[in-house]
């Protein structure tokens, strides 16, 4: 009887190890990656992970931000409340598609400063695209009332983008990444829909 119990216990341990292994495998398989992968069927994504950093000094430059390890993970739908700090948002992207032109957009318009920073590997320097509620539409990277930025990622390469936000109002919003053609097609459809309703 003792050997029978020992045999059952041994089999039970093996089954338990097997179940735990399957559970861990499934967890890793569906884990939320912090890198947004852009593939050929990609048109837009509004559900991915970002990282953010609160700069209470309001004086950090892009070099210091890029080298910082103080970022906290968050979904791209964020609500950080009223702060006097500058908020830096980090978005990691990997381009596995045949496209190279993409657009990053914030759905909230009331940021005094909403600048996008990225490292241009061909010129070996940081570039800044300025935007914000007080930036005239004619001076924006994309002439739209949205806070939107046009950027390129070469095929089969990765890029980290930093968005610098400064506001007098609460920090909240949603960051989305679009393929360039989808962004402009949906924008035209929205404008046309408005005029159809007018006449």
Residue ranges of each PLM-predicted region?
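N-terminal secretory signal peptides that target proteins for export/translocation
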Residues: 1-14
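Soluble non-transmembrane domains of integral membrane proteins
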Residues: 32-191
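Selective detector of the "anchor" transmembrane alpha-helix that sits immediately C-terminal
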Residues: 191-199
